[in-house]
Curated annotation (Swiss-Prot):
Annotated SUPFAM superfamilies: (Trans)glycosidases
Location(s), subcellular: Cytoplasm
Pathway the protein contributes to: Cell wall biogenesis; peptidoglycan recycling
Native species: Mannheimia succiniciproducens (strain KCTC 0769BP / MBEL55E)
Protein role: Plays a role in peptidoglycan recycling by cleaving the terminal beta-1,4-linked N-acetylglucosamine (GlcNAc) from peptide-linked peptidoglycan fragments, giving rise to free GlcNAc, anhydro-N-acetylmuramic acid and anhydro-N-acetylmuramic acid-linked peptides.
Active site: H177, D249
Name listed for the protein in its UniProt record: Beta-hexosaminidase
């Protein structure tokens, strides 16, 4: 069963990387800034991956907008999610702009033959260093409206959506890239506020995937949400009725270290309810997992996991030349770049 998403070292596909990508446990890969030189190079890299690895691979990236945008030169400079509400006074225009940002981001990525950009961020608030202006808003209702519009744009471009970081990463000050954060707030606060964007968008059938946080919510469970049956099975699957894909966040992050070595982290995330696992920046860890992770031959959830994986591949795509000649792209690329520049100038 394919379950792992891995990364590449540089701007060309190495022979040993092609071999790893062909491993039965590998479902896909995630691209980073280090894999990018310019648009021609990244298109050539993706084409080479598709040609040399003889199976469907889910190719992903973090191209959220704002400070999390892996490809910049030659692409629209996408605005930070906070800028929609912070820089635009007209509520209707906020929603229109968010929708066009979602569409344009997804359309540019699918034009490269990338299937999925992990978006949108549904965390509330801007105090957490790891989140900051990646969050739409501090309040539930405007955050849900803006995220819903952004999602509509992504879906129009044929890209699946990933809500992150469940059940909410916005109110911890520690960065889970560097350590395991603890959220000390009462569980009632998390359920009344932080989980609401996920709950409401799941109810609206707008989330195709969810990525849990490497955060321990001390008054709810002793495990990080990414390795917690309570959060992923009892709450996400049972209470919220979510039937889409659950991605682990990067198991190479320091915040996942609470769960043990790389094999233990992978086992714990799968046991808790994750369908697909991200393991980045740890090439030796990837080899350890591929050599030692033991999966059931035909687990009862195998068919559901395969169905969920298939649903994440892009549904349609322009070529780059086709996309950049459309009126929608021409109008919105300029507007969105200008919005991001205004946002940066205001800070």
């Amino acid at each position: 069963m394919s379950t792992l998403l891995i990364d590449l070292k540089g701007q060309e596909l190495l022979a040993e990387e092609a071999e790893l990508l062909a491993h039965p446990l590998v479902a896909g890969l995630i691209l980073f800034t280090r894999n990018f030189y310019d648009r021609s190079q990244i298109q050539a890299l993706i084409k080479d991956i598709r040609r040399r690895v003889k199976k469907p691979l889910l190719i992903t990236v973090d191209q959220e907008g704002g400070r999390v945008q892996r490809f910049r030169e030659g692409f629209t400079q996408l605005p930070a999610m906070q800028s929609f509400a912070a820089m635009i006074s007209d509520p209707a225009l906020q929603l229109t702009t968010a929708k066009e940002a979602g569409w344009l981001m997804a359309a540019e990525m699918t034009a490269l033959d990338i299937d999925l950009s992990f978006a949108p961020v549904l965390d509330l608030g801007h105090e957490c260093k790891a989140i900051g202006d990646r969050s739409f808003c501090e309040e539930v209702e405007p955050a849900v409206r803006l995220a819903s519009a952004f999602i509509d744009g992504m879906h129009q471009a044929g890209m699946a959506t990933t809500g992150k970081h469940f059940p909410g990463h916005g109110h911890v000050l520690a960065d889970s890239h560097l350590e395991t954060p603890y959220d000390e707030r009462p569980s009632a606060v998390i359920f009344e506020r932080d989980i609401q964007p996920f709950q409401q968008l799941i109810a609206q059938n707008k989330l195709d995937a969810v990525m849990p946080a490497h955060v321990i919510y001390r008054h709810c469970d002793s495990q990080p949400a990414s390795g917690s049956k309570y959060w992923l099975q009892d709450i996400l699957r049972q209470k919220l009725g979510f039937d889409g894909t659950v991605f682990s966040d990067d198991l190479g992050m320091k915040g996942a270290g609470f769960m043990g070595d790389f094999v233990a982290r992978s086992e714990k995330a799968l046991s808790a309810g994750c369908d697909l696992l991200l393991l980045c920046n740890e090439p030796e860890g990837v080899v350890q997992v591929l050599d030692n992770l033991k999966l059931e031959e035909n687990p009862p959830h195998f068919a559901a996991r395969q169905r969920r994986l298939q649903s994440l591949f892009k549904k349609k795509a322009f070529s780059w030349n086709e996309l950049t000649k459309t009126r929608r792209w021409l109008e919105n690329s300029k507007k969105l770049t200008a919005l991001q520049q205004s946002w940066l100038d205001s800070k």
